[in-house]
Design a protein with these regions (language model features):
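Conserved glycine-bearing catalytic or ligand-binding loops at nucleotide- and phosphate-handling centers
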Residues: 195
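Iron-sulfur-associated redox domains of electron-transfer enzymes in respiratory
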Residues: 15-68, 74, 78, 206-562
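A short N-terminal beta-strand-loop micro-motif at the entrance of redox/enzyme domains
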Residues: 9-15
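Charged, low-complexity surface patches
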Residues: 12, 134, 144, 187, ...
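Short structural boundary motif marking the start of a folded domain
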Residues: 1-4
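Fe-S ferredoxin-like electron-transfer domains
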Residues: 46-190, 203-218, 222
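Short strand-turn-strand beta-turns centered on an Asx-Gly dipeptide
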Residues: 6-9, 52-54
């Protein structure tokens, strides 16, 4: 604890880990390209450089605050220094900004404008590299890389994968997969966190918007959309609506106006997932086999297990993800000529997750060897489509989803935040429907920001040991403990992205804990407003089991990971 003088003003600090944090606490938005509080300090971009009263310059991100420090953040020397750094970065950077997918959201572009860089005095001598589009989810363009290392640290430290790293030195330095492999040839799980942390267009989402527009323009095609829970609390950010507010009704209106024929809510199939997964869990607990049960909703987590913990593949739940269940059910529904009305059905999935693109083409997620989810677009792609269509989103009136697959429970909505799957399972297993019981379940340890949460819940005279993890680095810690016999769980829920789908690789990029908290709160608020809290109380789900699903539960709702 102490006091610093920043640009002539006294600023107190307590437990801030670096000078940069204290400066921002003082209300000064000092620029950075390589600093993120969630990962280790790299100090490579030097944009956060400041000057002290002795004329010494240093990177504020890697300097600890000390009592009595006198800091100048915008001296003449510092301003020239920052401008020169950006100019040098741009000199070695692909500058096709008008056609770049990151245009308008690029941090480097914003800094060039902010610092007044209008002329590049230096020649670009950097080698041109081949664009890597081998991944079903992401595109890597090394020509737009500024060597900030954000993707490297996110992949290694947050996800524990290490698919990317630096190679070579000096002017030949580049970020690539090991042995210069294509990204699809590595252990990349398609989570998209590298794209979230990348400040430029060096890593971007592989878009499938053109396929959607093509389907919408075909009069012989019925275009059906499903919308994941986390999407509804992220779209509003783009239109300056309050952070985390659910805008599901506006999204439905926008999709109807763009020409989608049917729009369904993935919370419906989340309820199906809970029905199937809770039954599977109880069966395994009773038999005492294939425990712990590993949830299978997150495709990045599933790929992580199938790639790196093959001995635990039998522990994965055989349940399809909510996306997979919804697509299979809808395709089955429209196989009935009375429902099909002579049209081909194209299933479009709108997800917060880049890994869902990979899941959709995974052969073991098909039904009768046919792909159920035809196209997956992310929240970010949805925003571009809405903007492309010219809709004034903020002014749209809310509309309800279509039936019979447009209604879900509160348990289905909270799938979008870490711990939501487990909480919905616990609700399903509880015989008590009271508000007090629902509150007790929510307070048992299933909610919160911790990367690893462990708790025990009583069930029919036995203790159920549960672990909830978010971020694959945390998941690896959990799996190593299980593998070494250091932990004994009955149920493990993992979401590859920190805080869950609300911060997925396909979501609009908004830094900071406030965004995470607001999106999580938005889903919990949506849950609070729903009359039905438990998946087994959803009348549309119960009706489906008595009708379309009868005798087809395993075929449509489960898959085989072997």
């Amino acid at each position: 604890m102490g006091t610093m003088t920043i640009d002539g003003r006294k600023v107190e600090f307590t437990d801030e880990k670096n000078v940069l944090t204290v400066i921002r606490k003082a209300g000064i938005n000092i620029p950075t390209l390589c600093y993120h509080s969630e990962v280790s300090t790299f100090g490579a971009c030097r944009l956060c450089t400041v000057e002290d009263d002795r004329g010494r310059t240093f990177a504020s991100c890697s300097e600890e605050p000390r009592d009595g420090m006198v800091i100048y953040t915008n001296s003449g020397k510092i301003k020239k220094y920052r401008k020169l750094i950006v100019e040098l970065l741009l000199a070695a950077h692909c500058r096709d900004c008008t056609t770049c997918v990151k245009s308008g959201e690029c941090v480097l572009q914003e800094l060039a404008h902010r610092l007044g860089v209008h002329n590049i005095r230096f020649q670009n001598t950097r080698e041109q590299y081949e664009i890597d589009d081998s991944s079903p989810s992401l595109i890597r363009d090394p020509n737009k890389c500024i060597l900030c290392g954000d993707c490297v640290r996110a992949c290694e430290e947050l996800q524990g994968i290490g698919a990317l790293n630096f190679a070579y030195r000096g002017t030949e330095a580049i970020v690539i997969p090991a042995f210069n492999k294509k990204i699809a040839e590595t252990q990349c799980v398609n989570c998209g966190q590298c794209r979230v942390y990348c400040p430029t267009g060096a890593i971007s989402i592989k878009t499938h918007m053109d396929e959607v527009w093509e389907a919408l323009a075909d009069p012989d095609v019925r275009v059906v959309a499903q919308i994941a829970p986390a999407v509804r609390v992220a779209v509003g950010d783009h239109y300056s609506l309050p952070k985390g507010r659910s805008v599901m009704g506006k999204i439905v209106n926008a999709l109807h106006r763009m020409g989608f024929d049917e729009i369904y809510d993935t919370t419906f199939s989340a309820d199906l997932t809970i029905m199937e997964e809770s039954a599977e869990f109880l069966k395994r607990v009773e038999k005492g086999e294939k425990l712990p049960l590993l949830t299978s909703c997150c495709p990045a987590w599933v790929k992580f297990i199938t790639d790196q913990y093959k001995d635990y593949i039998p522990n994965l739940s055989t349940c399809r993800s909510p996306q997979g269940m919804m697509s299979a059910v809808i395709k089955e529904y429209f196989r009935d000529p009375e429902n099909a009305k002579g049209k081909k059905t194209v299933m479009v999935s709108i997800m917060p997750c880049t890994a869902k693109k990979a899941e959709a083409i995974r052969p073991n997620s098909f039904t009768d060897e046919k792909q159920d989810t035809d196209i997956v677009i992310t929240t970010t792609e949805l925003l571009r489509m809405i903007d492309n269509f010219g809709l004034d989103f903020a002014q749209l009136e809310p509309e309800a989803c279509d039936m019979p697959f447009g209604f879900g429970s509160g348990g289905g909505v909270i799938f979008g935040v870490t711990g939501g799957v487990t909480e919905a399972v616990l609700r399903r297993l509880s015989p008590d429907h009271s508000k007090e019981t629902m509150r007790e379940i929510s307070e048992c340890g299933v909610r919160g920001d911790e990367g690893i949460k462990e708790f025990t819940v009583p069930y029919k005279g036995m203790d159920i040991n549960v672990c909830v993890a978010s971020g694959l680095a945390n998941a690896r810690t959990v799996m190593e403990r299980v593998k070494n016999g250091e932990a004994n769980y009955h149920l493990i829920e993992v979401m590859a992205c920190r805080r869950g789908c609300i911060m997925g690789g396909g979501q609009p990029v908004r830094a900071g804990d406030r965004t995470k908290a607001a999106r999580a709160k938005g889903l919990y608020n949506a849950d609070n407003t729903m009359l039905i809290k438990k998946s087994d109380e959803n009348p549309m789900v119960l009706e489906l089991y008595q009708g379309l699903l009868k005798g087809k539960e395993h075929k449509l709702l489960h898959n085989d990971f072997f």
